[in-house]
From Swiss-Prot:
Residues the entry annotates as binding heme b b566: H97, H196
TM helices/strands, residue ranges: 33-53, 77-98, 113-133, 178-198, 226-246, 288-308, 320-340, 347-367
Known function: Component of the ubiquinol-cytochrome c reductase complex (complex III or cytochrome b-c1 complex) that is part of the mitochondrial respiratory chain. The b-c1 complex mediates electron transfer from ubiquinol to cytochrome c. Contributes to the generation of a proton gradient across the mitochondrial membrane that is then used for ATP synthesis.
Description of how the protein assembles with itself and partners: The cytochrome bc1 complex contains 11 subunits: 3 respiratory subunits (MT-CYB, CYC1 and UQCRFS1), 2 core proteins (UQCRC1 and UQCRC2) and 6 low-molecular weight proteins (UQCRH/QCR6, UQCRB/QCR7, UQCRQ/QCR8, UQCR10/QCR9, UQCR11/QCR10 and a cleavage product of UQCRFS1). This cytochrome bc1 complex then forms a dimer.
Name of the molecule in the record: Cytochrome b
SUPFAM superfamilies tied to this protein: a domain/subunit of cytochrome bc1 complex (Ubiquinol-cytochrome c reductase) (SSF81648), Transmembrane di-heme cytochromes (SSF81342)
Localization: Mitochondrion inner membrane
Cofactor note: Binds 2 heme b groups non-covalently.
Organism: Mogera imaizumii (Lesser Japanese mole)
GO biological process, one term: mitochondrial electron transport, ubiquinol to cytochrome c
Residues reported to bind heme b b562: H83, H182
Any Pfam family hit: Cytochrome_B
Keywords noted in UniProt: Electron transport, Heme, Iron, Membrane, Metal-binding, Mitochondrion, Mitochondrion inner membrane, Respiratory chain, Transmembrane, Transmembrane helix, Transport, Ubiquinone
GO molecular-function term, one example from the UniProt record: metal ion binding
């Protein structure tokens, strides 16, 4: 008799995705982040669900309801901080996952990569709206500043902003709709992640060498299930340490002050995972130009397959490209630091130079380096 996992309509989908899936024998720990992102998403949906049971999306009671969750609900403080810091872990895994894709040329799987870029935008939108919900000072002013960027769109900008706000300022209507969208988006993300996986399994995984691994495949279970469990344990250890020892490390103290439209915080800044994009936005003195640079700083990922000029897929055997890749990583860290600094003298110019370097590396220097390396192969 054939095994039920190979015949049952539902079980055979699970089987072909997580059990009998042929996987390259040489994929490193950089390939763990897909499963970690899945774990993060499940954790966020579960903790978010329990938070939503006690949260009220009204301007008068939102801040108090979050306080109530932390003080009065059983383990409410734990659920709240798991959710807030879970978002940080989600973005750490996301950035490492995307970085892995860039380094090893995984973007050559066009469909998988493009769904991934859409996923990145969806997760960023979800995180932004989630940050507005506690209705603290940084929530309110962050929502005001970021939504206001849409007013830079010619002709329809102002109408668009007021339509999103549901009035003439960020108010009750804005908070209610942000809560609704923040609740629904993770489920859309889960569906997109399924499509992401579907497209990936059409081609099979890439591997560090960038060469075809069809001649050397191993079953996903038990090899990579065990490996993923180890990754999950490391993730849980890191998240638990953050939540239990310093839950407010990555948050902003201003968000413990209830939202006040009459009092602007001295430095309006988003959560740490948006700072690199925020620095690029601020480095351009023109409003529309800044918004375009902000969007393009992430949308540029969709251009990666077209900017690939190398004869080799992976950067494993390309030392010049490797140097430029790590320069890009350093540049993003500098942008993240600048995004959290006030707009004054050394920081403005550093931010502008880092922004120019960011686009130059991706659009000009890395494709040129690949061409140079192609010629070096002939020697």
């Amino acid at each position: 008799m054939t095994n039920i996992r190979k015949t049952h309509p539902l079980m055979k989908i699970v089987n072909s995705s997580f059990i009998d899936l042929p996987a390259p024998s040489n994929i490193s720990s950089w390939w763990n982040f897909g499963s970690l992102l899945g774990i993060c998403l499940i954790l966020q949906i579960l903790t978010g669900l329990f938070l939503a049971m006690h949260y009220t999306s009204d301007t008068m009671t939102a801040f108090s309801s979050v306080t109530h969750i932390c003080r009065d609900v059983n383990y409410g403080w734990l659920i709240r901080y798991l959710h807030a810091n879970g978002a940080s872990m989600f973005f750490i895994c996301l950035f490492l996952h995307v970085g892995r894709g860039l380094y090893y040329g995984s973007y050559m799987f066009m469909e998988t990569w493009n769904i991934g870029v859409i996923l990145l935008f969806a997760v960023m939108a979800t995180a932004f709206m989630g940050y507005v919900l506690p209705w603290g000072q940084m929530s309110f002013w962050g929502a005001t500043v970021i939504t206001n960027l849409l007013s830079a769109i010619p002709y329809i900008g102002t109408d668009l902003v007021e339509w999103i706000w549901g009035g003439f300022s960020v108010d009750k209507a804005t908070l209610t709709r942000f809560f609704a969208f923040h609740f629904i988006l993770p489920f859309i993300i889960a569906a997109l992640a399924g499509v992401h996986l579907l497209f990936l399994h059409e081609t099979g995984s890439n591997n560090p060498s960038g060469l075809s691994s069809d001649t050397d495949k191993i079953p996903f279970h038990p090899y990579y299930t065990i490996k993923d469990i180890l990754g999950a344990l490391v993730l849980i250890l890191a998240l638990s340490s953050l939540v239990l020892f310093s839950p407010d490390l990555l948050g902003d103290p201003d968000n413990y002050i209830p939202a006040n439209p009459l009092n602007t915080p001295p430095h309006i800044k988003p959560e740490w995972y948006f700072l690199f994009a925020y620095a690029i936005l601020r480095s351009i003195p023109n409003k529309l130009g800044g918004v375009l640079a902000l969007v393009f700083s992430i949308l540029i990922l969709a251009l990666m397959p077209f900017l690939h000029t190398s004869k080799q897929r992976s950067m494993m055997f390309r030392p010049i490209s490797q140097c430029l890749f790590w320069l890009l990583v350093a540049d993003l860290l500098i942008l993240t630091w600048i995004g959290g600094q006030p707009v004054e003298h050394p920081f403005i110019i550093i931010g502008q130079l880092a922004s120019i370097l960011y686009f130059s590396l991706i659009l000009i220097m890395m494709p040129l380096a690949s061409l140079v390396e192609n010629n070096l192969l002939k020697w």
